[in-house]
Amino acid sequence: MAPQKVKALELLKWGVYFGMPIIATIHVLDPDRLDNLIMKHQFVVYPPEAQTQEEFKKKELEYFEKRTTKRLLEQQQQPTTN
């Protein structure tokens, strides 16, 4: 090959080597395209939460209150032997 063609080919290769990642990054980082890409290729889809954090904490507090009252009643009913 002639040296001029080799230089042109090398310039083309380096242009593609540096240009493609830049163009791909600009293309993918568009917020609408990024959201579409993420939604299209989801690996794990979680179901919506059954209860909110507040509901969960409320139920947890109710459970602990019931448990402590039950334990207190059991302790009161047990005969004390000294």
UniProtKB/Swiss-Prot annotation:
GO cellular component: mitochondrion
Record-linked InterPro entries: Pet100
Pfam families: Pet100
GO terms, biological process: mitochondrial cytochrome c oxidase assembly
Protein name per its UniProtKB record: Uncharacterized protein DDB_G0276777
